[in-house]
């Protein structure tokens, strides 16, 4: 006989209040038929590829900045306010019930210069020996560091959004109060999210890691990252952003392989399992008198290599058209700004400059110490954009949504809520600047505070570089052609081949004769 029993588990009820739904920009923003082109000048930067060169007298003064092909270049483009744009007819929209915004439709990131591979390294690299093809069982000494160089992991990447890209790296964490950590103990590590700034180092094959805080020997990483950290974009976090402002779309290409295999020198912090047992599952003890009785280090590493650089695998110097972003923000540039975060170390040639210290005559013989060697790296960029003008209705639902998402948007549109009436009488002092009265309260600043004032970006002003004549620019012509706004198809003309007339012979019909 079958009987029904009620479930003994927990009963899950829906939330008492409905979950707020985030609107997509296409639900309340309407595109117009007005398109504009904007472009930059040739953007150049020159510096030392490994470290900033500082003044000997004043260490806070930087004489030559650090410019590496493995650095992030974060461009912050300032767009003109479309509600005050002179090229837009006032009758095109209702300023009392609508506001104008820019929508990104196309972008081309130009990279100048030839392809090249730039190496990095460390003059005192923690390399005990070659662990791939060893020629003997070596013993450690007090200092086994060597002068080692390598080529970094090959990376091409760009991220487009209206807010800075979010990066991640592993950093030193605060240990627990109990048990108290002892000197030499491995510190705990944690994943940290920060904005990617201009000049931050990308991963070169050693991981997204804070080398300055977690490698105290200062010899386990190349010079360009040993005193800083490497960041990697947190694509998981940015792709799950409910508003989708930091990541409209992105392009990424990575390539590397392990070229050499080394082993670290030093005392092993984590001992091998069962080190003092007579019998262990990890090795068989060596005979007496053998070098293998003293185990060597077991911290193995591989040096990265980006390998071949080819023009067939370039992400740059080609247009990208944005029809549908991966997030809820479909290319709307809130606050009239656009962030382009990129890194490209396929154009990574480092220039070696040699200068003779003293003048030489014709009988001079070469001596290496008579020449000073310098190292410089250059970066060359040029960008073009296609923007579409869009309208935002000033309805109650839209304004409430924007106020929750970013209140600065409504402030920039000069949409202020009516303040409540004063609750009572207020105090007003005479001679407020005298010492007899209390300190005057500071008047609120009229200038808008930049939310990214403490971050470093490469600012580019595009407020005077917009043009509605798209046909006068290379990217504009390609946009017009691919979008069908102009007739770019070729009509095939029908051709008739005229040949000499041919004579057609008709056979004469015979009359039928009737015999009587």
Curated annotation (Swiss-Prot):
Biased composition, class Basic and acidic residues, residue ranges: 139-148
Top-level taxonomic group: Viruses
GO CC field: host cell nucleus; T=7 icosahedral viral capsid
Gene Ontology molecular function: structural molecule activity
Key words of the record: Capsid protein, Disulfide bond, Host nucleus, Host-virus interaction, Late protein, T=7 icosahedral capsid protein, Viral attachment to host cell, Viral penetration into host cytoplasm, Virion, Virus endocytosis by host, Virus entry into host cell
Record's compositionally biased regions (Basic residues): 506-516
Ranges where the record places region Disordered: 128-148, 496-516
Keyword Cytoplasm: no
Keyword Ribonucleoprotein carried by entry: no
Chief localisation class: virion
Localisation per UniProt entry: Virion; Host nucleus
InterPro entries attached to this UniProt entry: Capsid_L1_Papillomavir, Capsid_L1_sf_Papillomavir, dsDNA_vir_gr_I_capsid
GO biological process, any: virion attachment to host cell
HAMAP family noted in UniProt: PPV_L1 (MF_04002)
Family (UniProt): Belongs to the papillomaviridae L1 protein family.
Assembly and oligomerization: Self-assembles into homopentamers. The capsid has an icosahedral symmetry and consists of 72 capsomers, with each capsomer being a pentamer of L1. Interacts with the minor capsid protein L2; this interaction is necessary for viral genome encapsidation. Interacts with protein E2; this interaction enhances E2-dependent replication and transcription activation.
Role description: Forms an icosahedral capsid with a T=7 symmetry and a 50 nm diameter. The capsid is composed of 72 pentamers linked to each other by disulfide bonds and associated with L2 proteins. Binds to heparan sulfate proteoglycans on cell surface of basal layer keratinocytes to provide initial virion attachment. This binding mediates a conformational change in the virus capsid that facilitates efficient infection. The virion enters the host cell via endocytosis. During virus trafficking, L1 protein dissociates from the viral DNA and the genomic DNA is released to the host nucleus.
Protein name: Major capsid protein L1
Organism encoding this protein: Human papillomavirus 65
Gene: L1
